[in-house]
């Protein structure tokens, strides 16, 4: 059996062919406009036409995803996917069985299948990028919620909200790499597109005052979110993914800031699979669905 896997991101569509034991034998990536759903569908069709020997399709998609029906009620930045049944569309196009799951849940499933969560019953995955997302594994089960919105950690308040625009005070608006870059651009008067997270952290290492202030606020925001999550779900482990985790000292710096919150007994580590987590988690979900229907 070969499974075609798709991981729909904000700037890229990752594609792969994966074997049932988790070996990725082919990968491909296409740059996309995160809001262009039709382009994403077209890229999927091209990849499937190039790989006609696959016997199933697994999809990791953003937004609120009903994995049973395949309906995406809200597709995040991809407005084309609002109230769109991607599972039915792919099945009609190919005649193949299709399984679809939320992208953050796929990252968690990859950790459960082939990562550090294999023997765990209570853990969280947190992804830090242009936004903050996550997945919840509690009492031995993936938690999706009544409307498939569980794990939207970025919508937690990071500070007391204002009356007129409460969303301004969420983690998504205060504690992401995009926000960090915007803040640095404002304080230095430089164009946002010139600034990278790597540059800000390099300046932090060089004891640049602006970078030190912003990075300290960044870590404090993450710790605030982790504090809330730990007391909500009591996980034994939290695994963090996203580009920030490529920084060798990230976990050590995060734990240093966590000390002031009095949290020491939850194990916090980087996630295992980096950019392949979405593909692997989607395939694991596909295999679970196939076994359930047998």
From Swiss-Prot:
Functional summary from the UniProt entry: Catalyzes the ATP-dependent phosphorylation of cellobiose to produce cellobiose-6'-P. May have a dual role of kinase and transcriptional regulator of the cellobiose-PTS operon.
Key words, A-Z: ATP-binding, Carbohydrate metabolism, Kinase, Nucleotide-binding, Transferase
Residues annotated for ATP binding in this entry: 5-11
Gene: bglK
Similarity comment text for this entry: Belongs to the ROK (NagC/XylR) family.
Catalytic reactions on record: D-cellobiose + ATP = 6-phospho-beta-D-glucosyl-(1->4)-D-glucose + ADP + H(+)
Name of the protein in question: Beta-glucoside kinase
Gene source species: Listeria monocytogenes serovar 1/2a (strain ATCC BAA-679 / EGD-e)
InterPro entries on file: ATPase_NBD, ROK
Superkingdom of origin: Bacteria
SUPFAM superfamilies from the UniProt entry: Actin-like ATPase domain (SSF53067)
Root EC class: transferase
EC numbers, comma separated: 2.7.1.85
């Amino acid at each position: 059996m070969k499974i075609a896997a798709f991981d729909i991101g904000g700037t890229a569509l990752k594609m792969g062919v994966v074997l049932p034991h988790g070996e990725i034998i082919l990968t491909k990536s296409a740059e996309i406009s995160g809001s262009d759903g039709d382009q994403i569908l077209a890229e999927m069709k091209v990849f499937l036409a190039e790989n006609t020997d696959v016997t199933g399709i697994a999809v990791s998609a953003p937004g609120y995803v009903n994995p049973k029906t395949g309906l995406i009620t809200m597709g995040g930045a991809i407005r084309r996917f609002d109230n769109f049944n991607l599972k039915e569309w792919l099945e009609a196009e190919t005649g193949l069985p299709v399984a679809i799951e939320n992208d953050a849940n796929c990252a968690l499933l990859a950790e459960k299948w082939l990562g550090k969560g294999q023997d765990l019953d209570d853990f969280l995955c947190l992804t830090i990028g242009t936004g903050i997302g996550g997945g919840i594994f509690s009492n031995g089960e993936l938690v999706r919620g009544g409307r498939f919105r569980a794990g939207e950690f970025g919508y937690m308040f990071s500070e007391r909200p204002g009356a007129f625009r409460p969303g301004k005070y969420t983690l998504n608006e205060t504690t992401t790499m995009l926000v960090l870059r915007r803040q640095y651009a404002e304080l230095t008067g430089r164009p946002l597109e010139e600034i990278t997270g790597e540059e800000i952290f390099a300046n932090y290492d060089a004891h640049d005052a602006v970078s030190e202030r912003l990075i300290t606020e960044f870590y404090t925001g993450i710790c605030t979110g982790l504090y809330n999550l730990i007391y909500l779900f009591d996980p034994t482990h939290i695994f963090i993914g996203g580009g920030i985790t490529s920084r060798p000292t990230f976990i050590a710096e995060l734990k240093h800031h966590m000390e002031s919150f009095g949290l020491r007994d939850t194990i916090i580590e980087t996630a295992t699979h980096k950019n392949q987590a979405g593909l692997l988690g989607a395939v694991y979900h596909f295999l679970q669905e196939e076994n359930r229907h047998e």
